A protein has these predicted regions:
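Bacterial Sec-dependent N-terminal signal peptides
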Residues: 1-20
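Noncatalytic scaffold domains of N-terminal-nucleophile
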Residues: 19-49, 61-62, 66-182
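Surface-exposed charged/polar residues within alpha-helices that form helix-capping/stabilizing sites
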Residues: 52-53
Length: 182
């Protein structure tokens, strides 16, 4: 019995490393995730679930992306939100066509290149009100939805509105930034 125990102790560690790894690496890696009917991946599980629910309820990938992005603006306001910009690249397989959207903020209507020249600016200042643009995110959602959306914007945004009204668990990351900011 003592010899058997010794043999198990000696050979067990080698057995851990002797398995073939598809990646070719000798350490654990993340598993591949595959799906037959669509997938949503975000940095927040509730936002991902909202996107999945949109797909399951008849929405398409654009609808799910808008819904997940709206949820991230609520649930992770440190990195997302309606006060930012939106950029999208959309491939429509049936058309074999690629679409792009630049929904970055525009300057206020009266803030023109001529204004900067007349006031002797050689470049746009880094600080103050002049470098601020009008957020383009929400307009981007509606541009994408008008071109590619399948279900109503009310249905797309209602899960996030419900979380905004009823509350949701705050993630560790957001909690940290709230603490630092207070």
């Amino acid at each position: 019995m003592k010899k058997l125990f010794f043999a198990l102790v000696i050979f067990s560690p080698f057995n851990l490393f002797s398995q073939d790894r598809i990646t070719g690496e000798m350490f654990s890696t993340r598993s591949e995730v595959i799906s037959q009917n669509g997938m949503v991946a975000t940095s927040h599980p509730l936002a991902s679930q909202i996107g999945i629910d949109i797909l399951q309820n008849g929405g398409n990938a654009i609808d799910a992306a808008i819904a997940a992005n709206a949820a991230l603006g609520l649930m992770e306001p440190t990195g997302n939100g309606i006060g930012g910009d939106l950029f999208a690249i959309v491939w429509i397989e049936k058309e074999k066509k690629l679409y792009g959207l630049n929904a970055s903020g525009r300057s206020p209507e009266n803030l023109t290149l001529e204004y900067f020249k007349e006031n002797n600016f050689k470049s746009i200042p880094a600080y103050g009100p002049l470098p601020v643009s009008v957020p383009g995110c929400v307009d981007g959602w509606f541009e994408l939805h008008n071109k590619f959306g399948k279900i109503s914007m009310a249905d797309i945004l209602s899960p996030t509105i419900k979380y905004a009204e009823d509350g949701f668990p705050v993630s560790e990351l957001v909690s940290y930034y709230m603490k630092v900011a207070s």
